[in-house]
């Protein structure tokens, strides 16, 4: 008996409809639920950032291996966000699909973005504290701590223009990853689909504002307890977080 198999992925028009429906759901979500889910997303991205810095602590790796494999390590964060249904500020940029179709208002959109941004920040800071208390930075002869400071110092050395445009490029790739995730019909589809866009933006050195909610405080904390190079203070932190 012949069986009509479903296509490998959703068609672009179906993805658009799915993105609009997701935007409506996010815009009408109660504050408490949205904030908690955003905290989870911030924590998940921080987990990806932690995986990335642990990998980078191996000084024997070539530059190319660090960028590409490190990018794949960072993918953990967005995989967890998409599969677990958490609320990520950068991915929620696709809510403009629902706004442009008139299904949500500007006030709903902005309220959601502000709520999720704050929740992401809180979640990332919680992971910073947990990583410190767990002593993860002491791994590999404390090379992980040096890696954490090095990543943060590299980000704070950029000028404002470079940060801004790297932030735009990063979110293009993040939205493409989320779009591909919407296209997938299974968990495997979603995971495989998002790997390359996320690994690519990490390898290219683009700037992800939620990831920096982890990288910069973690690097600053490591410097404060005596590791690595100088990491600039609160003004630089705010400059990096404002890049979106």
Task: Give the location of each predicted region.
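Alpha-helical transmembrane segments and their helix-helix packing motifs
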Residues: 1-244
